[in-house]
Amino acid sequence: MNIAVKPVTHVRAVNWNRIEDEKDLEVWNRLTGNFWLPEKVPLSNDIPSWATLTAAEQQLTIRVFTGLTLLDTIQNGVGSIRLMEDAATPHEEAVLSNVSFMEAVHARSYSSIFSTLCSTPDVDDAYRWSEENEFLQRKSAVIMEQYRSGDPLKKKVASVLLESFLFYSGFYLPMYWSSRAKLTNTADMIRLIIRDEAVHGYYIGYKFQRGLERLGDERKQEIKDFAFELLLELYDNEAKYTEALYDGVGLTEDVKKFLHYNANKALMNLGYEALFPGEACKVNPAILSALSPNADENHDFFSGSGSSYVIGKAVATEDDDWDF
């Protein structure tokens, strides 16, 4: 089969000294300043507390992280790439390339957790489960449909709902364990992921709002109706996914409140009003406390915890330097 390839006749080099939208540089600096890798987080310190979880709790944790891996895989391989097609400037495209890479880092992070804490058969079972779970596959299909739609604004709506809403049924569990002094180093890494996703959702939501500015009132209302309808469709599925995961440990209602809270956050990123009333968004205070970037950090030599780290600088020494 012959595939016609349009020749590239004109390419514009990205010039960071001439910024068309200052938000691009602001977010670029934030994302690069936040750069991290899972290999720097001491996950092995969580092996003792992992052993205190029941078999059912371990299975739940592995499945939750596998579900998150699937969403990160979509964002890395499809979502960010589709958004780059609509980038208004080379700087926006560069920021989205960073977003894509960090989604790959996030997916890699869950594999680091698995290889450190879990047995290979248990992990393989979870990956099979992710391919067969109807609710996980359904939300993936809904998001993928919008990424393939060709509508730049609808793609951004889908991306913000994934980044700022769908991830959080999974993020709840490591925060829950952390609030009980379990898997604290794993929670530190999840907080690094949450920090990234917060910037991603904010930035893509900002670009969405900039796109809306160029539309007439009728088209704006059409997009708003679409956003709320898509959120409700995803929420209905996410509630069922949450029930299937968390009913066995009695956490379903708490997780749903967390979902309501973050659904409203996603709408805020899009510039819309909240959908769920305050009463439905009363998240367990222990979970909100665990979400804080400094929740478990004491940076002592015994804990090893910390949701940030510093890459050390090597300094050359000689034997005489060690004569005290």
Describe the predicted segments one by one.
Residues M1-F324:
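Non-heme di-metal
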